[in-house]
């Protein structure tokens, strides 16, 4: 299944706020209206919607998300928590959380077009897993810096998660540590996502 490129507002109206996909928010009460329109949701549908929420927020294909679930399942600790850490530490999501891109698809485009350096080397793989002490900067070219500055200026000035630091005048972000569960950028029940995949196998 390919990455979603359709109308974004349609998705947030059905699944709720997806800040990685779009800064728009569904009107209050729209989720309740949808629930009454479609009737009582089955347990399968609840798990499916939670999985879709995760997939659309982080901009993943079905195959990519399944691969992350399998990696998380083999790691120590809670599969759901490890899954969220893996997704949050992706380079495209890290740029988004730093405010250097307005959405995760926008961050992915910056990476694909080779505007981003990690530890002074160009990284053009959005799924690159950021590690503690990674230094994320832009190329010295004026176009790269202008793109990043525009995003920083227009992004809502919310408090950064503790695992990140932004030096906006230097166009530089620092990864301080692995993200903790309290700083995840999406309201999600990750256990339902794990349950969804465990019942598919």
From Swiss-Prot:
It comes from the Eukaryota. It holds the Pfam family Ribosomal_S4. GO terms for biological process: ribosomal small subunit biogenesis; translation. The keyword Hydrolase does not apply. GO terms for cellular component: chloroplast; small ribosomal subunit. It is found in: Plastid, Chloroplast. Keywords: Chloroplast, Plastid, Ribonucleoprotein, Ribosomal protein, RNA-binding, rRNA-binding. Residues 89-152 form the S4 RNA-binding domain. Residues 16-37 are annotated as: Disordered. One of its GO terms (molecular function) is rRNA binding. Its main location: plastid. One of the primary rRNA binding proteins, it binds directly to 16S rRNA where it nucleates assembly of the body of the 30S subunit. HAMAP family: Ribosomal_uS4_B. Part of the 30S ribosomal subunit. Contacts protein S5. The interaction surface between S4 and S5 is involved in control of translational fidelity. PANTHER family: 30S 40S RIBOSOMAL PROTEIN, SMALL RIBOSOMAL SUBUNIT PROTEIN US4M. Belongs to the universal ribosomal protein uS4 family. This is Small ribosomal subunit protein uS4c.
